[in-house]
Each structure stands twice: as structure tokens, then as C-alpha cells.
Curated annotation (Swiss-Prot):
It is a single-pass type II membrane protein. The keyword Cell cycle applies. NCBIfam families: ftsL_broad (TIGR02209). GO terms for biological process: FtsZ-dependent cytokinesis. Belongs to the FtsL family. GO terms for cellular component: cell division site; plasma membrane. The chain crosses the membrane at residues 22-42. It comes from Buchnera aphidicola subsp. Schizaphis graminum (strain Sg). Keywords: Cell cycle, Cell division, Cell membrane, Membrane, Transmembrane, Transmembrane helix. InterPro entries: Cell_div_FtsL (IPR011922). Residues 1-21 are cytoplasmic. Residues 43-81 are extracellular. Essential cell division protein. This is Cell division protein FtsL.
Length: 81
């Protein structure tokens, strides 16, 4: 009697591709969606940091503008001598 040998890796691959197509597609979808979430969160954090920097610059410019208005008004006032 001859012992029948099975090619186990081949059988596993065949079963996986026959019965696991949906699982592979879902796994790929999960990985892509997770990557998308990471990229969106990273870009959002960059934009928030940029917005904070722009707000600081705006505040500095606004303060400088107010100081210039005060200086202009002080210069245009007639001196009391």
C-alpha cells in the first residue's frame, strides 16, 4: 500500500483563495481605511498648528497696528508749551 502525500501549503493556499476572498477584500479595506484615518489626523494636526501660528502672527500685527495708531495720535497732538 502506497502512502498518499498531500501538498499542505498548496491545499492551504487553494482553500484560502477559494473561501477567503471576502476576508482578503475586507482586510485590505480595513488597512486602507486605517491608513486614511492616520493620514487625515496627521494633516489635521498640521493645519491646526499652522492656524495657531497664523493666529499668533495676526495678534502681533494687530498689537503693532494699535501701537502705531497710538503713536500717530500722540505725534499729531499739539504740544502744550
Amino acid at each position: 500500500m502506497k502512502i498518499k502525500r498531500y501538498d499542505l501549503p498548496k491545499i492551504i493556499k487553494k482553500d484560502f483563495f477559494i473561501y477567503g476572498k471576502i476576508h482578503l477584500i475586507l482586510l485590505l479595506a480595513i488597512i486602507l481605511s486605517a491608513n486614511s484615518v492616520v493620514i487625515v489626523v496627521y494633516n489635521t494636526r498640521l493645519l491646526i498648528a499652522e492656524e495657531e501660528n497664523l493666529n499668533l502672527k495676526t495678534k502681533k500685527k494687530d498689537d503693532e497696528w494699535r501701537n502705531l495708531i497710538i503713536e500717530k495720535n500722540a505725534i499729531s497732538m499739539p504740544s502744550i508749551h
